[in-house]
Amino acid sequence: MANTGCLSPGAFLSKVPEFFQTANEKHITVRLTAKRLIEHDPVEGNLEFDSTNHPDYDVSKKASEISVSSRSDREYPLLIRMSYGSHDKKTKCSTVVKASELDQFWQEYSSVFKGGMQNLIKKKKKKSKNGTISKTGKKNKVAKKN
């Protein structure tokens, strides 16, 4: 497994075209994930992991319905991961983007990301016997009447 570790946002953006080029040549999938980064404190614990007693730190839909007098104004960095391959042949890298730099990063990321999707081929839809095309590409079964 090749792990380039946590790169700077600029270095990560320079790796994106390399990942897409390799994935296009090998005909494999590139996986991209993004999530809020919370550093775990094993001694004191984190309020973010205790949504029952501290619902203001929970970002789920249920927590947004609860009115809370004191809300968390803390800004969290965003962890972005990219990988392709599987098991021993997996190649991956990641970056951490601060909330204040997020808008600029997304603009650069989207332009680089779109450039890597040029080799996508639109799937051909299959026609069924009655001439209609299903959304899944499978034939529509028509029940015969006796």
UniProtKB/Swiss-Prot annotation:
**Which processes are annotated in GO (biological process)?**
protein targeting to ER; SRP-dependent cotranslational protein targeting to membrane, signal sequence recognition; SRP-dependent cotranslational protein targeting to membrane, translocation
Give the matching InterPro entries: Signal_recog_particle_SRP14, Signal_recog_particle_SRP9/14
Its name, as the record gives it, is Signal recognition particle subunit SRP14
Residues that bear Phosphoserine: 8
Identify the gene encoding this protein: SRP14
Report the sequence similarity comment from the record.
Belongs to the SRP14 family.
- Listed SUPFAM superfamilies: Signal recognition particle alu RNA binding heterodimer, SRP9/14
Region Disordered, residue ranges: 121-146
From the UniProt record, which GO molecular function terms apply?
Answer: 7S RNA binding; endoplasmic reticulum signal peptide binding
Pfam families from the entry? SRP14
Task: Name the principal localization, coarsely classed.
Answer: cytoplasm
Query: Could you tell me where this protein is found in the cell?
Result: Cytoplasm; Nucleus
State if DNA-binding is listed as a keyword. no
What cellular component GO annotations does this protein have? Answer: nucleus; signal recognition particle, endoplasmic reticulum targeting
**Keywords annotated in UniProt:** Cytoplasm, Nucleus, Phosphoprotein, Ribonucleoprotein, RNA-binding, Signal recognition particle
Q: What else is known?
A: Present with 8000 molecules/cell in log phase SD medium.
Q: Which domain of life is it from?
A: Eukaryota
Give start-end positions of Basic residues composition bias: 136-146
Give the multimer and partner information.
Component of a fungal signal recognition particle (SRP) complex that consists of a 7SL RNA molecule (scR1) and at least six protein subunits: SRP72, SRP68, SRP54, SEC65, SRP21 and SRP14. At least SRP14, SRP21, SRP68 and SRP72 are proposed to get assembled together with scR1 RNA as a pre-SRP complex in the nucleolus which is exported to the cytoplasm. SRP14 binds RNA as a homodimer.
The function of this protein is: Component of the signal recognition particle (SRP) complex, a ribonucleoprotein complex that mediates the cotranslational targeting of secretory and membrane proteins to the endoplasmic reticulum (ER). The SRP complex is required for the cotranslational protein translocation for ER import and preferentially recognizes strongly hydrophobic signal sequences. It is involved in targeting the nascent chain-ribosome (RNC) complex to the ER and is proposed to participate in the arrest of nascent chain elongation during membrane targeting.
